[in-house]
Amino acid sequence: VISAEIMQVHHQKHHATYVNNLNAAEEQLAEAIHKQDVTKMIALQSAIKFNGGGHINHSIFWNNLCPSGGGEPTGPLAEAITRDFGSFEAFKEKMTAATVAVQGSGWGWLGLDPTSKKLRIVACPNQDPLEGTTGLKPLLGIDV
């Protein structure tokens, strides 16, 4: 259970800051492109990755939430979890292990490998977005 206060801080402060900082970096990037200032373009990459990743990750996170909890998945997702991890319990254990292993801040992800069509559990540091850094399609993200 996540408190309403934590969710408000996350949404109104953290996520809003990522969006505002991303917008500012994009404006600076547009100016650097217009001026053909390659040094400035390169310097902005880390701000775009961090703040863009924070926006992407939190947008996925909000879409994953359910008012009374999600319970166990059903249908094709449940079948894929059983196929790739053995059981829902085994999936939860592996997801927990990967997520608690994150040092500092980061994300634990359940992602779909578009080539093999298999589910994978991956941890990403900081605000690195899953798809942009691994190519996996994000299905479930846990903010650490």
From Swiss-Prot:
Free-text remark on how the cofactor is bound: Binds 1 Mn(2+) ion per subunit.
Q: Which residues form a coiled coil?
A: none
Which ranges does the record mark as transmembrane? none
Q: Does the keyword Glycosyltransferase apply?
A: no
- Might you give the EC number(s) for this enzyme? 1.15.1.1
Q: Tell whether Transport is among the UniProt keywords.
A: no
Q: Could you tell me which InterPro entries the record lists for this protein?
A: Fe/Mn_Superoxide_Dismutase (IPR050265), Mn/Fe_SOD (IPR001189), Mn/Fe_SOD_C (IPR019832), Mn/Fe_SOD_N (IPR019831), Mn/Fe_SOD_N_sf (IPR036324), SOD_C_sf (IPR036314)
Q: Would you tell me the Gene Ontology cellular component terms?
A: mitochondrial matrix; mitochondrion
Q: Which UniProt keywords apply?
A: Manganese, Metal-binding, Mitochondrion, Oxidoreductase
**MF (Gene Ontology):** manganese ion binding; superoxide dismutase activity
Residues at which Mn(2+) binds: H10, H58, D143
From the Swiss-Prot or TrEMBL record, state where the protein is found: Mitochondrion matrix
Name the SUPFAM superfamilies for this protein: Fe,Mn superoxide dismutase (SOD), C-terminal domain (SSF54719), Fe,Mn superoxide dismutase (SOD), N-terminal domain (SSF46609)
Domain of life where this protein originates? Eukaryota
Cofactor(s) it depends on:
Mn(2+)
Reaction(s) catalysed by this chain's protein: 2 superoxide + 2 H(+) = H2O2 + O2
Q: Extract the PANTHER family matched here.
A: SUPEROXIDE DISMUTASE 2, SUPEROXIDE DISMUTASE [MN], MITOCHONDRIAL
Write out the function statement from the record: Destroys superoxide anion radicals which are normally produced within the cells and which are toxic to biological systems.
Q: How does it assemble?
A: Homotetramer.
Family assignment from sequence similarity: Belongs to the iron/manganese superoxide dismutase family.
Name under which the protein is recorded: Superoxide dismutase [Mn], mitochondrial
Q: Which organism is it from?
A: Branchiostoma floridae
Q: What broad taxonomic lineage does this protein's source fall under?
A: Eukaryota, Metazoa, Chordata, Cephalochordata, Leptocardii
